[in-house]
């Protein structure tokens, strides 16, 4: 069985419909359990209760970057192989990615204010995340502005290529520049820098929950986009008749 079989809308609708309830259940279980567990953890000796924002901020930030990279992959599949489901999946993922980026920006400001004494700083990672959020908005606006769906998919695919620079910059900005207020990677594996287990395990669970939540929303929104495309085709056929 080839993976490209799932680019067929009929095959995708059947398979996604079968797994969607399980994905939703897993997303709810992991997210709720991880967040409750996380917010019951003890306060950090340096950051106090504000450290608990990590259970929202880190999963949202990781998903914001990875969703854009997923959109890049599906857009490349569209540009190379012209599979419509991949283009619709990229379109469906964009609003979810925009919300994740916004959550990361807001929670980052709330988390950083007590530590930095300011709600915003033109730190490399913060700035690249803001630019990534603007790319998400531009991507969605471009889909709405171009009437022909195939042309819209082509143009947004090119935009994905450009925006991927900022997605990667958001991920590795702390490594590129030593200056800046933002701390290093929260899940660093370097000796002496690993997060305490009391925070690490609920964070892993919340990250899994956010991934499953994205997957559930992606399947739901892609299925909706396929139905819209089918309805538009039927209406166009009736108008020609």
UniProtKB/Swiss-Prot annotation:
Pfam families: Cytochrom_C_asm (PF01578). The keyword Cell membrane applies. It is a multi-pass membrane protein. Signal peptide: none annotated. The chain crosses the membrane at residues 19-39, 53-73, 92-112, 126-146, 157-177, 200-220. GO terms for molecular function: heme binding; heme transmembrane transporter activity. The keyword Cell inner membrane applies. Keywords: Cell inner membrane, Cell membrane, Cytochrome c-type biogenesis, Membrane, Transmembrane, Transmembrane helix, Transport. Its main location: membrane. It is found in: Cell inner membrane. GO terms for biological process: cytochrome complex assembly. InterPro entries: Cyt_c_assembly, Cyt_c_biogenesis_CcmC, Cyt_c_biogenesis_CcsA/CcmC. GO terms for cellular component: plasma membrane. Required for the export of heme to the periplasm for the biogenesis of c-type cytochromes. NCBIfam families: ccmC (TIGR01191). Belongs to the CcmC/CycZ/HelC family. This is Heme exporter protein C. It comes from Paracoccus denitrificans (strain Pd 1222). The gene is ccmC.
């Amino acid at each position: 069985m080839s993976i490209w079989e799932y680019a067929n809308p009929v095959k995708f609708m059947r398979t996604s419909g079968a797994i969607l309830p399980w994905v939703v259940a897993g997303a709810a279980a992991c997210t709720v359990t991880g967040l409750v567990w996380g917010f019951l953890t003890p306060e950090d000796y340096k950051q106090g209760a504000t450290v608990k924002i990590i259970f929202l901020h880190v999963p949202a930030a990781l998903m914001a970057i990875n969703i854009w990279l997923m959109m890049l992959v599906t857009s490349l599949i569209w540009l190379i192989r012209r599979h419509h489901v991949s283009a619709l999946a990229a379109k469906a993922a964009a609003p979810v990615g925009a919300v994740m980026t916004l959550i990361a920006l807001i929670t980052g400001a709330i988390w950083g204010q007590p530590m930095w004494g300011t709600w915003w700083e033109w730190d490399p990672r913060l700035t690249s995340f803001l630019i990534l959020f603007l790319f998400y908005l531009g991507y969605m606006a471009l889909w709405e502005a171009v009437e022909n769906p195939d042309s819209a998919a082509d143009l947004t695919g090119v935009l994905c290529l450009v925006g991927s620079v900022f997605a990667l910059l958001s991920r590795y900005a702390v490594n590129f520049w030593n200056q800046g207020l933002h701390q290093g990677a929260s899940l660093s594996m370097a000796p002496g820098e690993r997060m305490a287990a009391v925070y690490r395990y609920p964070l892993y669970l919340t990250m899994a929950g956010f991934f499953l939540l994205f997957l559930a929303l992606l399947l739901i929104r892609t299925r909706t986009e396929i139905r819209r495309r089918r309805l538009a085709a039927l209406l166009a056929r009736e108008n020609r008749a």
